[in-house]
């Protein structure tokens, strides 16, 4: 058992909320801060890629008794569905017979996780902007603006779960011997939508991860519980087939007719979706160390943001929590050792997953359409 600590988690995303549940179960006081409004009260932004939960993620949920609860809001996916340019559709089953992953809507999952964290006793503070953290004594500084007046919030321990552009990491970067790199991909993404049939069923096979591989660009689709699909168009920002060349309705419609002909009947709002939803960037970040003394630790994307082509971003963040929990069980109140062993264990794995994710774009966009692959 650990001596109860007053702990702040900065970031109410998936990793921050699951971490809050783990910490509460260990008897700590947990406050979660987020500069955004409560996701349960806001309209969807049109800038999200559906999530894939694999064994790594399920283990972390299983260990705390949440696996079955989360499976209720997911859809089992047991194969890739490959849509070739000539209209041919083929399937590639995952691994062993019966092996599968789960498709989850980020928004639906995040809302549920916040509910579960509140039920566990964590307190959430939304619309609260954290601008800085004192690494020496685990104090947060919040205020309306970066240049305005700040208020100090005192804690025993702070976790930065505030994503690729983490404010907690920003403070750590100013320390000597802190390594940090950031790389924006030349590929962006845009969300599109396949609505449900009138009777609420799915227009295409709901148990497939749908891929339209086209070389240096591709379309992907994953099913939602309401009968719809969230689709994501990944393509270069510039060049022959790129976002910069899809500037008007005619060009867009012609482009989809040429490269994605079988989507014509299933994406009725293509033009509206394409020009309404933002074109978003993909960024990879790496850093080390992830922790400072026994006071502050980074977790999830704040320590290792990766590109989504291996479907492991959330799973890697959840695995961070699994390893952190192992270290808490092993080392009790010795937070310095907990943090040191946590980062030592996770850093090589996070780097490996980042590289696999980058490489998997080539496999998904090109090789899945290769006859030898099929």
Sequence positions of predicted segments:
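C-terminal helical "tail/cap" subdomain of flavin- and related membrane-associated enzymes
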Residues: 3-5, 326-374
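Helical element adjacent to the flavin cofactor pocket in flavoenzyme catalytic cores
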Residues: 104-128
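Glycine-rich phosphate/pyrophosphate-binding beta-alpha loops
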Residues: 218, 282-286, 303-315
């Amino acid at each position: 058992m650990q001596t109860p600590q007053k702990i702040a988690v900065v970031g109410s995303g998936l990793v921050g909320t699951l971490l809050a549940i783990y910490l509460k179960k260990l008897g700590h006081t947990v406050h979660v801060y987020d500069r955004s409004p409560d996701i349960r009260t806001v309209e969807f932004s049109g800038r999200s890629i559906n999530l894939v939960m694999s064994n790594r993620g399920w283990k972390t949920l299983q260990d705390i008794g949440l696996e079955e609860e989360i499976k209720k809001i997911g859809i089992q996916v047991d194969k890739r569905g490959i849509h070739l340019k000539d209209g041919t559709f083929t399937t590639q089953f995952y691994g062993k017979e019966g092996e599968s992953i789960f498709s989850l809507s980020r928004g639906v999952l995040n809302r549920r996780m916040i509910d579960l964290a509140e039920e566990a006793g964590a307190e959430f503070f939304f619309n609260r902007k954290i601008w800085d953290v004192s690494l020496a004594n685990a104090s947060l500084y919040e205020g309306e603006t970066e240049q305005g007046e700040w208020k100090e919030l005192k804690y025993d321990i702070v976790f930065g779960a505030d994503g690729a552009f983490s404010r907690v990491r920003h403070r750590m970067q100013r320390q000597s011997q802190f390594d940090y790199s950031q790389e924006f991909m030349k590929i962006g993404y845009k969300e599109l939508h396949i609505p449900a049939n009138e009777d609420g069923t799915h227009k295409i096979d709901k148990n497939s991860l749908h891929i339209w591989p086209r070389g240096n660009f591709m379309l992907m689709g994953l099913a939602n519980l309401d009968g719809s699909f969230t689709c994501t168009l990944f393509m270069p920002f510039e060049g022959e087939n790129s976002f910069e060349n899809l500037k008007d309705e005619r060009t867009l419609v012609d482009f989809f007719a040429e490269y994605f002909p079988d989507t014509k009947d299933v994406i009725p709002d293509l033009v509206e979706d394409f020009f309404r939803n933002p074109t978003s960037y993909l960024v990879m970040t790496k850093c080390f160390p992830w922790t400072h003394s026994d006071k502050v630790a980074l977790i999830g994307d704040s320590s290792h943001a990766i590109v989504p082509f291996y479907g492991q971003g959330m799973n890697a963040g959840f695995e961070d929590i699994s390893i952190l929990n192992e270290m808490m069980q092993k080392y009790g109140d010795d937070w310095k050792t907990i943090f040191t062993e946590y980062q030592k264990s996770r850093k090589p794995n996070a780097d490996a997953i980042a590289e696999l994710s980058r490489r998997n774009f080539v496999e998904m966009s090109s090789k899945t359409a290769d006859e030898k692959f099929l």
